[in-house]
Amino acid sequence: MSAYSFSRVPVKVPLVKTKNRAIQTKIPAPGTEDILIKLDNYESRSMQGTVPLVWESAYGFNVFDIKGNKWIDFTSAIFLTNIGHSNPRLLKAIRATLEKKLIHHFTYPS
């Protein structure tokens, strides 16, 4: 279990406005409490020490919540460091693949 757990009730925090970050509401963002409480019940207890952030969208190395708070994604090293979130070239390739009649077959190359 994590040694620290963030509040699931929105608390007032200092406002932030920089090129890469914007915190303009209480944290967690109002309206995300129910999701965070459900996550506490289903996710590993070791995850409960993470910042209480429910992603709404992401671009480049930034993620956004439903209230427009803008965060730097320091977790992207696992998946997206090389290309970033919503990379236009990757999105184009994914869309082209989804338009094919066959996306994958277990036994044969596709």
What is each PLM-predicted segment?
Residues 29-32, 47, 58:
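Intrinsically disordered, low-complexity segments enriched in small/polar residues
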Residues 52-74:
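Active-site and channel-lining beta-strand-loop segments
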Residues 40-56:
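Short, basic/aromatic recognition patches
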Residues 32-38:
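Flavin-binding catalytic cores
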Residues 6, 10-24, 29, 43, ...:
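Glycine-rich loop-to-alpha-helix module at the N-terminal edge of alpha/beta enzyme cores
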